[in-house]
């Protein structure tokens, strides 16, 4: 991912070959047909099988903070039913990513859905065009957007600047980052357990 802005990091695969691997319950896609030879050094994502189950021409997978903030809640399905009315979406309980998740989804009819929300994990969105995927993603993000917590004052930032002045550290660019590090509730949550394992 470190080169994603400068290079094409996607591995084009034969979708039918991937679907055949799903039927054979094989997790390793290394032998699925790679469509362009110069991509042979890249490995397909562990979640390729999940994406292949969707009928859409374009599929995007995101670990959206807004989506995850709901996907970790015990009553998230009920809340999301209300917030995502009018969008064809599916709730999927937590299962380890890769073949176990794909096997579960293969038993469900995912072809009717444009949005799949994975508990404790993220969201998968499908569309017939890139623009359609982006539009659906924006709708989901807008509906699930949460207010920003915390208030970082400029005077506090100047104190931090004086502390790091003689060190090799740089302060984060955005004030919001400082707010996150000073929020008592967030510090309590992060001190317990990881909210989403994958």
List each model region and its residues.
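Glycine-rich flexible loops
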Residues: 1-198
């Amino acid at each position: 991912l470190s080169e994603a802005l400068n290079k094409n990091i996607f591995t084009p695969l034969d979708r039918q070959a991937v679907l055949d691997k799903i039927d054979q319950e094989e997790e390793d896609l290394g032998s699925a047909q790679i469509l362009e030879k110069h991509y042979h050094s890249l490995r397909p994502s562990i979640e390729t099988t999940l994406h292949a189950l969707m009928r859409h021409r374009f599929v995007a997978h995101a670990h959206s903070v807004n989506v995850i903030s709901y996907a970790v809640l015990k009553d998230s399905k009920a809340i999301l039913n209300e917030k995502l009315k009018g969008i064809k979406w599916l709730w999927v309980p937590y299962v380890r990513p890769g073949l176990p998740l794909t096997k579960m989804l293969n038993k469900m009819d995912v072809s009717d859905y444009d949005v799949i929300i994975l508990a404790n994990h993220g969201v998968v969105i499908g569309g017939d065009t890139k623009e359609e995927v982006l539009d659906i993603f924006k709708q989901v993000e807008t509906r699930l957007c949460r207010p920003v917590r915390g208030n970082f004052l400029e005077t506090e930032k100047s104190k931090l600047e004086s502390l790091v002045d003689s060190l090799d550290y740089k302060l984060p660019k955005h004030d919001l980052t400082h707010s996150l590090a000073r929020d008592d509730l967030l510090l309590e949550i992060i001190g317990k357990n990881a909210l989403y394992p994958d």
